[in-house]
């Protein structure tokens, strides 16, 4: 992960190799926000620290006993979506609150790139609308766990 920090700081293009063969190449921004190859995806997941964070998050009581009106979600976003207060907006529009359990934002090639793990809470209809709104705004949203 230390080496990846150096790559993020000084490079604008990156190539990923496995067993002496090129498996993926692109801009640092593209590789970190949309890795295509499974090995690259695993590498980026490790380099961003989300794997380690998820181990700790899944041990939290609030996650283990997730309320029925809640979902645990992983949000990834880049570029202009960071220009708006998306978490505040879903609360104002849909009365869906977000409990931020993990967040990270970096600047890659002068573009803000972020990810969060949140518990979104609200009534079922509003929760679905808020999720759709986030996705329409350009947020990649993956529900990791639904409330029981």
Language model regions located:
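H-loop/switch region of ABC-family ATPase nucleotide-binding domains
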Residues: 1-2
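A short, surface-exposed alpha-helical micro-motif characterized by mixed small hydrophobic
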Residues: 7-11
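Short, glycine/charged-rich "phosphate-handling" switch motifs in NTP-dependent
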Residues: 13, 25
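Catalytic metal- and UDP-sugar-binding loop of GT-A-like glycosyltransferases, i.e.
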Residues: 17
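Short acidic-hydrophobic catalytic motif
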Residues: 29-33
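ABC ATPase nucleotide-binding domains
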Residues: 45-121, 128, 143-148
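Short amphipathic alpha-helices in soluble, non-transmembrane regions
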Residues: 89, 129-138
């Amino acid at each position: 992960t230390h080496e990846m920090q150096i790559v993020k700081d000084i490079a604008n293009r990156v190539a990923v190799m496995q067993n002496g063969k090129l498996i993926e190449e692109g801009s640092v921004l593209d590789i970190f926000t949309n890795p295509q190859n499974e090995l690259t995806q695993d590498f980026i997941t490790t380099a961003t620290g989300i794997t380690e964070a998820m181990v700790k998050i899944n041990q939290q009581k609030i996650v283990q006993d997730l309320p029925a009106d809640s979902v645990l979600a992983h949000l990834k976003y880049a570029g202009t979506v960071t220009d708006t207060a998306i978490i505040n907006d879903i609360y104002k529009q849909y009365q869906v609150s977000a409990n931020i359990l993990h967040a990270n934002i970096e600047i890659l090639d002068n573009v803000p790139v972020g990810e969060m793990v949140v518990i979104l809470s609200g009534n079922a209809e509003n929760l679905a609308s808020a999720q759709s709104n986030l996705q329409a705004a350009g947020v990649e949203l993956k529900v990791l766990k639904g409330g029981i």
